[in-house]
């Protein structure tokens, strides 16, 4: 037995097409061709039989057509004048070209590729011009081991003609009527009983055809249209239907090393190396025959593949999903789709154990481990592991959106985005969470949601170690470290690090408040504000301080509160260096330096430096007192006044003077007291220059100059500048002792 001594290379399994042949393939078939070629190349790389990337693969991955022009240039000058003479000779001999006829070029090419994949098991060698076979012999062409074949003139014409359709023979010129020396002898690994087996079968007027470099023999009758394909490997017989089928498959990694056949049909026990062979075999059970053999009982080897190809060309959908009703033109596409419903993921990554429902998805995943990104964007230099990802990315620069929604006309850069968008109109939510039953219209949303149950946060910041459940959140967070603010407001020029923050900011200019409370009707520009507001009505306070146990209805309030315990004051005033724990406090403080009072009361025209001060002041006019003491029921217009009042009931005095030990119930009282020790008098009268340590004393003194007497006696209507003076005066009417 002659063994194949050299390692299989990509050239051995590559199949190229001419312009004419590619014109017969629709988009689905062209995609299938590309996938098969790329899969063969990756399998060779994985087993170490290919150390470089051929130009053909690079061109296929970039979906370019330059390679077709090159092949046309290489072969065009040899196939012009010769074709007419060869076709005349072939028709005279009663032969037909099956490359573009009943047997499609696609089926022949795939069969050639599958046979080349197994060429490591036997060596094919052709030499010489003389043969022991007559032009017409009386037996099926089952060639035995060690037999020589001489190709006659008609045979040579056919061989040369087949060479025009097959791109396996590249850059070789074969004159009409001649066969290269490398073809003249064929050594096949079969039994030595060839002559006996040929003589025992009574089939007349058969002519042998052989394809270059491949041990495939087809017998075409002068009187019938039967197509019988002979090959070195014996035809596999189906026990249920009795028909013979061919294994037509690309090179796979498993079949090279183990010979394992993992794809088995439901109708019979026949097993195959790949799914495409299984799909072709299943057509036999469906009773599909080649048009060339429609008048006979016997099926041809390729008959199962022809109806599938015809349905793809015509766009007819013959296979339907019982789960969702989606239609497909090929049963293989239906089976792949059904894994969406069953959850089956037969393709597993050996590096990380992740599984996929399609082999193409596994190949796309593998570069994640290698880190290889050979495809670079010419515009921004960004790298990608797949050419398809690069093509999709390029649409960001070109603005191309080729996928349009027929309902609303919205455009998308990716088909998957369009499909997900269409579910908005249909309301379809096919993806269901197994833990809580929640349904989603997009699989990515389901995967993201599942991290809520698993608490998985796979995306980690290299700078601070913070983890995120979404890659998008990580990218947004990283801008905190880089200071990048790619989103600019055209109105005010303000920059933002995230698109969501930018969109929320734009509502400041537009005044849009899309989030409205159903209870009180109040509107909000951001959903987070709206959700926090709703807790005012529900009383929910889900955020708890771990130090003191205090609860808050908003996470931001909790973060601000925690700085009370840590003493952190990240917001510094550039004028005086004073620190603040909250940004709002810093903004309020800065008005002290600028003197700005942008908030104006519409009732009395009084102005304030802070919005909170304006809101507190407006309650003077409305009489609103929303802050009520739970102990005595007394109400106050300001929260700070309520907090001071509550100390009366508790007797608590948490603020202590370190100089004299005196305690105070309010921090302002402690601050005013400390000026007794320091002698500080920050409040100075501009009229007389007198200084005061407390603001209340300063305000009282100013009434001396203004003549204001706001405290009026209810009995005699006499006015006083100080409350204490009024209280002293009232004793005159009550008869109290001085």
From Swiss-Prot:
Residues in KRAB domain copies: 8-79
CC annotations in GO: nucleus
One Pfam family it belongs to: KRAB
Chief location bin: nucleus
ZnF (C2H2-type) ranges: 263-285, 319-341, 347-369, 375-397, 403-425, 431-453, 459-481, 487-509, 515-537, 543-565, 571-593, 599-621, 627-649, 655-677, 683-705, 711-733
Keywords tagged on the record: DNA-binding, Metal-binding, Nucleus, Repeat, Transcription, Transcription regulation, Zinc, Zinc-finger
Location(s), subcellular: Nucleus
Disulfide bonds: none
SMART domains assigned to the protein according to its UniProt record, in alphabetical order: KRAB, ZnF_C2H2
A molecular function (GO) term: zinc ion binding
PANTHER family for the chain: ZFP2 ZINC FINGER PROTEIN, ZINC FINGER PROTEIN
Role this protein plays: May be involved in transcriptional regulation.
Family under the similarity heading: Belongs to the krueppel C2H2-type zinc-finger protein family.
Name under which the protein is recorded: Zinc finger protein 235
Organism this protein belongs to: Homo sapiens (Human)
């Amino acid at each position: 037995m002659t063994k194949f001594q050299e390692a299989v290379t990509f050239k051995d399994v590559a199949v190229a097409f001419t312009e004419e042949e590619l014109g017969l393939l629709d988009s689905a078939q062209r995609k299938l061709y590309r996938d098969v070629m790329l899969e063969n190349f990756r399998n060779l790389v994985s087993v170490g039989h290919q150390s470089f990337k051929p130009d053909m693969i690079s061109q296929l991955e970039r979906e370019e057509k330059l390679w077709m022009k090159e092949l046309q240039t290489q072969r065009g000058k040899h196939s012009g004048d010769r074709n007419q003479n060869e076709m005349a000779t072939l028709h005279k001999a009663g032969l037909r070209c099956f490359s573009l006829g009943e047997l499609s070029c696609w089926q022949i090419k795939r069969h050639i590729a599958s046979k080349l994949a197994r060429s490591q098991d036997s060596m094919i060698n052709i030499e010489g011009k003389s043969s022991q076979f007559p032009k017409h012999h009386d037996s099926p062409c089952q060639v035995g081991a060690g037999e020589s074949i001489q190709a006659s003139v008609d045979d040579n014409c056919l061989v040369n003609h087949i060479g025009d359709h097959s791109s396996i023979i590249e850059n070789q010129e074969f004159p009409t009527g001649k066969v290269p020396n490398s073809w003249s002898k064929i050594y096949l690994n079969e039994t030595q009983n060839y002559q006996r087996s040929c003589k025992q079968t009574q089939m007349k007027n058969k002519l042998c055809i052989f394809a270059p470099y491949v041990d495939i023999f087809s017998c075409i009758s002068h009187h019938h249209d039967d197509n019988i394909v002979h090959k070195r490997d014996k035809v596999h017989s189906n026990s249920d239907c009795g028909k013979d089928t061919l294994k037509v498959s690309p090179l796979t990694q498993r079949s090279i090393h183990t010979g394992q056949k993992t794809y088995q049909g439901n109708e019979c026990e026949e097993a195959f190396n790949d799914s495409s062979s299984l799909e072709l075999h299943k057509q036999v059970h469906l009773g599909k025959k080649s048009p060339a053999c429609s008048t006979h009982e016997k099926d041809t080897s390729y008959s199962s593949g022809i109806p599938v190809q015809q349905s793809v060309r015509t766009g007819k959908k013959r296979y339907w999903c019982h789960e969702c009703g989606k239609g497909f033109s090929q049963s293989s596409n239906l089976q792949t789709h059904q894994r969406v419903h069953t959850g089956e993921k037969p393709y597993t990554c050996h590096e990380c154990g992740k599984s996929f429902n399609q082999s193409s998805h596994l190949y796309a995943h593998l570069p994640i481990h290698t880190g290889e990104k050979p495809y670079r964007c010419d515009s921004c230099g960004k790298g990608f592991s797949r050419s398809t990802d690069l093509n999709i990315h390029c649409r960001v620069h070109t603005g191309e959106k080729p996928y349009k929604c027929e309902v609303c006309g919205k455009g998308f850069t990716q088909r998957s985005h369009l499909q997900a968008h269409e579910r908005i109109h249909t309301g379809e939510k096919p993806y269901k969470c197994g833990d809580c039953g929640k349904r989603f219209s997009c699989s990515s949303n389901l995967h993201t949601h599942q991290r809520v149950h698993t608490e998985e946060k796979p995306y980690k910041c290299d700078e601070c170690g913070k983890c995120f459940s979404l890659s998008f959140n990580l990218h947004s967070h990283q801008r905190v470290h880089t200071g990048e603010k790619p989103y600019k407001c055209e109105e005010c020029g303000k920059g933002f690090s995230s698109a969501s923050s930018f969109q929320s900011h734009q509502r400041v200019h537009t005044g849009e408040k899309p989030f409205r409370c159903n209870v009180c009707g109040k509107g909000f520009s951001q959903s987070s504000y709206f959700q926090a507001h709703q807790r005012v009505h529900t009383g929910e306070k889900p955020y708890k301080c771990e130090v003191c146990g205090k609860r808050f209805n908003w996470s931001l309030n909790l973060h601000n509160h925690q700085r009370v315990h840590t003493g952190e004051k990240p917001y510094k005033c550039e004028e005086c260096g004073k620190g603040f724990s909250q940004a709002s406090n810093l903004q309020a403080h800065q008005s002290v330096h600028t003197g700005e009072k942008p908030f104006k009361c519409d009732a009395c025209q009084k102005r304030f430096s802070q919005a909170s001060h304006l809101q507190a002041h407006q309650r003077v006019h409305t009489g609103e007192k929303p802050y009520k003491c739970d102990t005595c029921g007394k109400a106050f217009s300001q929260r700070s006044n309520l907090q001071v009042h509550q100390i009366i009931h508790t007797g608590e005095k948490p603020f202590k003077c370190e100089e004299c030990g005196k305690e105070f119930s309010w921090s302002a009282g402690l601050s005013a007291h400390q000026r007794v020790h320091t002698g500080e008098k920050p409040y100075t009268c501009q009229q007389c220059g007198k200084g005061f340590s407390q603001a209340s004393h300063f305000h009282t003194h100013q009434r001396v100059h203004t003549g204001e007497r706001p405290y009026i006696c209810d009995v005699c209507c006499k006015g006083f500048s100080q409350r204490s003076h009024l209280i002293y005066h009232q004793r005159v009417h009550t008869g109290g002792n001085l």
